[in-house]
Structures are given as structure tokens and as C-alpha cells.
Amino acid sequence: MKKILLTLALAIPAFSQTSIKDALAKHWKVTGDFTIAVAKLMPADQYGFRPVPIELSFGQLMVQVGGANLNACALASGMTRPAVPTKLSDALKDEKIDIDKDTAVKFLSDSFDFCNQAVASMTPEKLDAVAGTTRKMTGFEWLWSYFTHTAHHRGQAEVYLRIKGIKPPDYVF
């Protein structure tokens, strides 16, 4: 009986361990929901706001996150990257073009949906495979580096909200 209990005591923690893929899937979902919540808090008439002229507007910042998500998740997974609508790609090249809230939030949401699908499709081999043309990283590195990229820009967006007197959502992880 003692051997059985000892075996179970040692085996049960192994069953509860989370795989890297599961952890990535969980955190991509959380960071997506959190980032979209930040995006939705900015009033539509403030999507062109920039704290200083050299910074991206709030709308451009949200679209920049979405575009980077598409690139990273496509490279990591091997899935075909969805096309970026012309209006949005033009706005990222020309900072004088405004991006409206509905368009930005939809694009951002769609980018996280794509990333959630991409992460779900990943095999251990894909996580370890090197991908990229000019910048080569493993699938895991693409996902993790752009996870942190999203956090960086979400932090900027939270400052934009605070400048406008809007309290960002509480931090979640």
C-alpha cells in the first residue's frame, strides 16, 4: 500500500504540469483579451491622439500590434498570414492617415484570433523549428518575442489612456 501511495504521490504532479504550448496558448489568450480591453477603453474620437507629435496615434499603435501579431504567428506556425486591409497598411506607412476605433479594434481582435489558432496548431517540432527570412528564430521565440512586443505597446497605450484621464483595466496575467 505504501508503494502505491508513494507512486501516486510522485506521479500526480507530472500529470498537472503544463506544456510550453499550453502555457503559450493561455498567455496569448489573456494578453489578447487584456490588449483588446485597453483598445476599447479609448473613446472613438481620441483614436487619433498622440502624446507628442513623433509618437504613433492610439489607433496606429493598436494596428501596429495587430500587424506584428499576424507576422509572428504566421512565421511561428507556418500558417498563411491573413491580409492586412489596404487602409490599415497605408496608415502604418503614412502617419497622417487616421485609423478609426471600430476598424482598429476589429483588426486587433482578428489578429489575436489568428494567433490563438496558430498557437493551437503548433507541434513541439514547430516550436523548435527555425523560421524567418532576414531574422531567424524558433517558433517559440517568434511567439514569445511578439508576446513581449504586445506587452510593450499595450503599456504605451495605457499611458495614452492615463493622459486622457482614463483608468486602464487592472493588470491580468
Go through each PLM region and give its residues.
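Sec-dependent N-terminal signal peptides
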Residues: K3-P13
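Acidic/histidine-rich alpha-helical segments that form the ligand environment
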Residues: K93-V130, E141-H149
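Short, contiguous alpha-helical
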Residues: A25, K29, D33-I36, Q46-D90, ...
